[in-house]
Each structure stands twice: as structure tokens, then as C-alpha cells.
Amino acid sequence: MITKTTRWPSPAKLNLFLYINGQQENGYHELQTLFQFIDLCDHLTITANQSGQITLAPDIPGVKTEDNLIWKAATLLQQHSQCEFGAHIEIEKILPMGGGIGGGSSNAATVLVALNFLWQLNLSNDTLAALGVKLGADVPIFVHGFAAFAEGIGEKLQPATPKELWYVLIKPEVSIATVDVFTHPNLVRNTPKQPLNALLEATYVNDCEKIVRSVYPEVDYQLSWLLEYAPSRLTGTGACVFAEFNSEKEAQDVYSLIPDNATGFIARGMNTSPLNRTLEEYKSLCKI
């Protein structure tokens, strides 16, 4: 066990496009989507210990410890590996909840990767991803740490290298439950599947966007505002919307115009997760 206190990034992601191709008998939807990380991150400061207990600080308002994906991920890893070690995890939270940028899934993946290292379990990324999918369909993306084209219910991953653009994100003052979007009767569920090359060359679309804009006026308003300046879309099932730019200056210029009552961020697209780089740095320092 490595007892040194370590600090780990937990990055957000964007769905650059999202197509819904059908629905399985079990209710899960068949998707085609392109994930890319952005340099907007929560951070987790983790100290492994011999207590056998998982403790978190500070509490997240409205979330019980046993419902927190960070705690769930650590406990799941303990149980799977029969590890008797514990950990104290401090959370620096900046990613908005219910935003469609993967904050909870990313937190879970960061815990799996970090504790696998600190507890010296030596589990493969495939094993960690298999554990992670029990916590959320997006967790494997964050475990593997590369931008990816995903199919199936999101579990079939193929590395991809979309342009690393600059983005302006706006988080409307609403939280959207994924299940509410995917169960909406008017959701498009029959977009034909296409090869990745064709999708990459086409105009990017999110099949959830029309429904979300119709049900949540706040999302429609903010997305309409962004569309005045640049190509813009919903990410995931929302609520975050984003506009894309070729340069940081272009993004900064539009960001400076965001209405005072809106919560916004500037971020850079990344095809390799900062979590990967942090892990390699700690391995080098500890000569593992």
C-alpha cells in the first residue's frame, strides 16, 4: 500500500454527437456517440490507510454517503479485490451535477484507478472498466482514458481522435435526469447506424436535443444564445450545452458575453484524459 497523499483529476466529457439507433427489449437504448474529455475537472485528494473504512469529506448536499458514486466505487473495489485497506477521500467539486458532462461517472472512475494504484491491486483497466459499468454506463470511458466512439449501450469502445477544439459551456439552472429523457414518448429512437468515418465527416447532431429543448425552456434559451455565435449542441441528455471554437481567443470573446445570470465555463478538448497522465507521473515517482 502507498500511504502518500495524492491528488487526482476527475475530468468532464462531452458527447460531440449522440444518435439513438433503437431500443432493446430490456429497455436499454442502442447508441452511437463520440466522447471527448475536456480540461474541466473535479479533483480528489486520496490518502490510503489501514482502517478498512472509506471516508469522504466534505459531504455533498443532498447526497447520502452510501449513494455517492465515489463511496460506491471504493467499496466495490474493496469487495472485488477482498482488500482490507481503507482510504480517506477529499472532494473538490466544480463539475455541475445533472449536467450531462459525466461528473459522477468520472469521480467513480478516478477512485477505481487511483485506489487500484494506491492499494497496489494491479488490476487491469479492463477489469476496472467491468466494475465501473456496474456504477454507470459512462464509467469505462473515464477508466480507459481515451476519446472514443461508442456503440451498443455505450460499452463498445473504439479509440478516436476528434479535433481538440475550444469550448464554451453553459449550465442552465436545471438538473435533468437521464431516465426522463430516454423514456420520453417523442424521443427519436430510429436513427440509422452509420460507419464511424461517415459520422465524423457529417454535421454533428444530438438526438436528445429536440426533446430536451421542448421540455426545458432554460436549455432552449441558453442553446439558442450560443447558436448566435458558433455551432452548438446539447451534451448527453443535458443540461449542459456547448459551443465549439478553433481558438482560445474566440472562446474567450464569446464567454465574456455570457449573461450575468448564466453559469459558464471555458474548456479545451482533450483526447487523452489528464487522469492517465497523473497515474503515469505517480508510477514514475513511486517507480512502479
Swiss-Prot record:
GO biological-process terms attached to the record: isopentenyl diphosphate biosynthetic process, methylerythritol 4-phosphate pathway; terpenoid biosynthetic process
Keywords: ATP-binding, Isoprene biosynthesis, Kinase, Nucleotide-binding, Transferase
Statement: the UniProt record of this protein carries the keyword Cell membrane: no
Binding site for ATP: P96, M97, G98, G99, G100, I101, G102, G103, G104, S105, S106
EC number, UniProt record: 2.7.1.148
InterPro entries noted in UniProt: GHMP_kinase_C_dom, GHMP_kinase_C_sf, GHMP_kinase_N_dom, IspE, Ribosomal_Su5_D2-typ_SF, Ribsml_uS5_D2-typ_fold_subgr
Keyword ATP-binding (UniProt): yes
SUPFAM superfamilies in the cross-refs: GHMP Kinase, C-terminal domain, Ribosomal protein S5 domain 2-like
Pfam assignment, any one: GHMP_kinases_C
GO molecular function: 4-(cytidine 5'-diphospho)-2-C-methyl-D-erythritol kinase activity; ATP binding
Top-rank taxon: Bacteria
Pathway membership: Isoprenoid biosynthesis; isopentenyl diphosphate biosynthesis via DXP pathway; isopentenyl diphosphate from 1-deoxy-D-xylulose 5-phosphate: step 3/6
Swiss-Prot/TrEMBL catalytic activity: 4-CDP-2-C-methyl-D-erythritol + ATP = 4-CDP-2-C-methyl-D-erythritol 2-phosphate + ADP + H(+)
Enzyme class (EC, first level): transferase
Catalytic site positions: K13, D138
Recorded family membership: Belongs to the GHMP kinase family. IspE subfamily.
NCBIfam families named in the record: ispE
Function: Catalyzes the phosphorylation of the position 2 hydroxy group of 4-diphosphocytidyl-2C-methyl-D-erythritol.
The protein, known as: 4-diphosphocytidyl-2-C-methyl-D-erythritol kinase
Organism: Aliivibrio fischeri (strain ATCC 700601 / ES114)
Lineage: Bacteria, Pseudomonadati, Pseudomonadota, Gammaproteobacteria, Vibrionales
